[in-house]
Amino acid sequence: MSVVVRRSAAARRLWSWESFCQWITSTENRLYIGWFGVLMIPTLLAATFCFVIAFIAAPPVDVDGIREPVIGSLLGGNNLISAAVVPTSAAIALHFYPIWEAASLEEWLYNGGPYQLIVFHFLIGVWCYLGRQWELSYRLGMRPWIAVAFSAPAAAATAVLLVYPIGQGSFSEGLPLGIAGTFYFMLAFQAEHNILMHPASWLGVAGVFGGALLASLHGSLVISSLIRETSEEESQNAGYRFGQQEVTYNFLAGHYAFLGRLGIPSLGWRNSRSVHFWMAALPTLGIWAAAIGIGLMAFNLNGFNFNQSILDSQGRFIPTYADLLNRANLGIQAMHAPNAHHFPLLLAAKAD
């Protein structure tokens, strides 16, 4: 009798594990979880909770490592625009700095420990979300291009939050987690690396703007070439039935006939798949290029810098936009430099 009981208990445990696996990998759930979701959900929740608490009530952080803490929380006097989670202190550099590595919680907060906690958990969650997209596509029999497209913003987040601090030797150089902090990072990055003159930045701008142009063009042509299924008194939108197999707009009328007559007829699209491919490919390639550029400049492979101005045959200075850009970079570098505490000459003489 005892043998039968042990077998039934083992079978019950096996059934519960199998049911858990089926529930995790089921495509019938309202929200697909997947095995990547098992890791994604707790990491993103941890990053979100820590970010909200730090954004509201974090104490000042000695980000430059010179005993001049910077406060970024709302309770410290900031508003929603200026508030940010301040990066980990330069005194920590690239060391892994969990709570148990600090002597006290106050020390961990003073050195910007929450920034590392948020960044590491967030990046793990982002890449698990990418894996979850691939996993759901695989189980539904779809091709994996959704995950490939999402790899572009995932790579961009990894570049500014992890690769750039590693290349610069300190997490204090990472992106501050806030609105004004993001623009501060952009200005400091331009001053240090001249990203506006880097080919990867050019490719990124061309890809993102090209994708935006193509998306607005395609969307406007679709809305303008809807196939009417209703009377003149009713809206065309009322003729759509959810899940219908019939097409809802005339692709050739919009892209080939209308757009072809506005521009070059031979360049008018005849295939909707090619349009949607370029709508996905252009911004994906552009953001990939920008992420690669951040990775290159993290190790000081900077943009073009024309340090020597153009001179005419008589040696006279000819001003160009490159000179204006260099002057702007020098000005931003001066504002970005930490306070070195230069004492007045009188005090320095008395100290001697």
Swiss-Prot record:
Keywords: Calcium, Chlorophyll, Chromophore, Electron transport, Herbicide resistance, Iron, Magnesium, Manganese, Membrane, Metal-binding, Oxidoreductase, Photosynthesis, Photosystem II, Thylakoid, Transmembrane, Transmembrane helix, Transport. A quinone binds at residue 218. It catalyses: 2 a plastoquinone + 4 hnu + 2 H2O = 2 a plastoquinol + O2. Pheophytin a binds at residue 129. The record marks 193 as: Stabilizes free radical intermediate. The keyword Transit peptide does not apply. Chlorophyll a binds at residue 121. The chain crosses the membrane at residues 32-49, 121-136, 145-159, 200-221, 278-292. It is a multi-pass membrane protein. It comes from the Bacteria. InterPro entries: D1/D2, Photo_II_D1/D2_sf, Photo_RC_L/M, PSII_D1. Fe cation binds at residues 218, 276. GO terms for molecular function: chlorophyll binding; electron transporter, transferring electrons within the cyclic electron transport pathway of photosynthesis activity; iron ion binding; oxidoreductase activity, acting on diphenols and related substances as donors, oxygen as acceptor; oxygen evolving activity. The record marks 164 as: Tyrosine radical intermediate. Residues 349-352 form a propeptide. The record marks 348-349 as: Cleavage. PSII is composed of 1 copy each of membrane proteins PsbA, PsbB, PsbC, PsbD, PsbE, PsbF, PsbH, PsbI, PsbJ, PsbK, PsbL, PsbM, PsbT, PsbX, PsbY, PsbZ, Psb30/Ycf12, peripheral proteins PsbO, CyanoQ (PsbQ), PsbU, PsbV and a large number of cofactors. It forms dimeric complexes. HAMAP family: PSII_PsbA_D1. Photosystem II (PSII) is a light-driven water:plastoquinone oxidoreductase that uses light energy to abstract electrons from H(2)O, generating O(2) and a proton gradient subsequently used for ATP formation. It consists of a core antenna complex that captures photons, and an electron transfer chain that converts photonic excitation into a charge separation. The D1/D2 (PsbA/PsbD) reaction center heterodimer binds P680, the primary electron donor of PSII as well as several subsequent electron acceptors. PANTHER family: PHOTOSYSTEM II D2 PROTEIN (PTHR33149:SF12), PHOTOSYSTEM II PROTEIN D1 (PTHR33149). Cyanobacteria usually contain more than 2 copies of the psbA gene. 2 of the reaction center chlorophylls (ChlD1 and ChlD2) are entirely coordinated by water. Belongs to the reaction center PufL/M/PsbA/D family. This is Photosystem II protein D1 2. It comes from Synechococcus sp. (strain JA-3-3Ab). The lineage of its organism: Bacteria, Bacillati, Cyanobacteriota, Cyanophyceae, Synechococcales. The gene is psbA2.
